[in-house]
Amino acid sequence: MKATELRDKSAQQLNEQLLELLRDQFNLRMQKATGQLGQSHLLSQVKRDIARVKTVLSQQAGK
């Protein structure tokens, strides 16, 4: 996911995307805790995506 793609979305779409990413992060953390997570890079990838969405939301709120 690119920041330029996110800037084209509305605040409502970004909030929906943020909720989805937070759910994904929770599920990945649970998989890691139970030893079922095979692709550990997904945790950091989702974490960065959450940060991107939050950054774009705060930039849009500042305008």
Curated annotation (Swiss-Prot):
Superkingdom, natural source: Bacteria
Cytoplasm recorded as keyword: no
Pfam families cross-referenced by the UniProt entry: Ribosomal_L29
Cited InterPro entries: Ribosomal_protein_uL29, Ribosomal_uL29, Ribosomal_uL29_CS, Ribosomal_uL29_sf
GO molecular function: structural constituent of ribosome
Assigned keywords, A-Z: Ribonucleoprotein, Ribosomal protein
One GO term (biological process): translation
This protein's GO CC annotations: cytosolic large ribosomal subunit
HAMAP family per UniProt: Ribosomal_uL29
Protein family (similarity comment): Belongs to the universal ribosomal protein uL29 family.
Protein name per its UniProtKB record: Large ribosomal subunit protein uL29
Annotated organism of origin: Ectopseudomonas mendocina (strain ymp)
Lineage: Bacteria, Pseudomonadati, Pseudomonadota, Gammaproteobacteria, Pseudomonadales
